[in-house]
A protein has these predicted regions:
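Solvent-exposed interaction patches of small proteins and small membrane subunits
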Residues: 1-126
Length: 126
């Protein structure tokens, strides 16, 4: 995979994170996802963007696993597994887990993805 292709994937992840954070800003507690139709709609929309993030991570993993290994503080395998859950067993998606992902893990992921993109843009050669 070329440097430009990886940057495009990272840009897609950054865009998805932005949308997740924008949508999640309307959620105060986990049950906000299930107590009203708007919350259910937000849960669906956020879950789909988490799926996009997971699919993008899997694409990088297939072609340049060493890139992900350089940023070992992110649990890349869990991101990929959550993508699989959303894709193949959506009925088992737990709103409390989605809340935790958005509240706890997405801000750190955004920071790391932006660092990766900067590093690749400046010096990374495949």
């Amino acid at each position: 995979m070329s440097k430009d292709e990886i940057i495009d994937i990272l840009d897609l992840i950054i865009e998805s994170i932005h949308l997740v954070q924008e949508r999640f800003s309307r959620i105060r507690v986990p049950d906000d996802f299930v107590l009203a139709q708007e919350g259910v709609t937000l849960l669906d929309a956020i879950s789909m963007r988490l799926q996009v993030i997971g699919e993008s991570v899997k694409r990088i993993e297939k072609t340049d696993l060493s890139l992900l290994q350089r940023y070992a503080d992110i649990e890349w395998d869990k991101i990929a597994r959550f993508r699989d859950l959303v894709s193949h067993h959506y009925e088992h998606v737990d709103h409390e887990i989605v809340y935790d992902i958005c509240e706890t893990h997405i801000p750190k992921l955004r920071e790391v993805i932006q660092k990766m993109r900067t590093a690749i843009s400046e010096s990374y050669e495949l």
